[in-house]
Amino acid sequence: VVRDKTNKIIGDRAFSNRVKIVSKLGDYCIKMYTKNRIGTVIKHIPGHGLAIYDSHFSTPAVNEKKKILNNIDFLAFKNKKSLFAMTAHIIYSQYDSNNTATHSKIIIDDIIRKKLKFRHLLISDDICMKALKYSLKENVIRSLKAGCNLILHCNGNINEMRIIANNVPKIDDFVIKKTSQ
């Protein structure tokens, strides 16, 4: 959901500044793409509209009240049928002031899985973005422990790929089932 202070990195990639429009357009896009056998990824869950900084370069922190987050930003993602969702590298301080959503078991379990009822594959955003403050290996481990099913790595650096490959488990039955649909 776009806001007045939404960082320009999201601006024109969001559907609207109204949660109902975002939600309905999201449902429609997921339905039509799926009907045509095209996979969808909803992002950046649980919401990126209140982030004023670009998570490619720094760690955004959202300090909004839970009621507003739940009724606007998070609500846009509720009950979505997409087979994939991508996490936000954003700290939501009202829920977990120490971790980005990607590294937060609280955000992933309580918000994304329970409140928003997302039951499919959760992908980290690019694991090399500057919003994540640990080493590559630690970012991978923290993302998986928090509840991400897959790790996204975008820069093509083979040495980084080896670090990631050496720190991720073999694909489990949940991932196999979801990617076979």
Predicted features along the sequence, with ranges:
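Short, conserved phosphate-binding/catalytic loop or strand-edge motifs used
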Residues: V2-I9
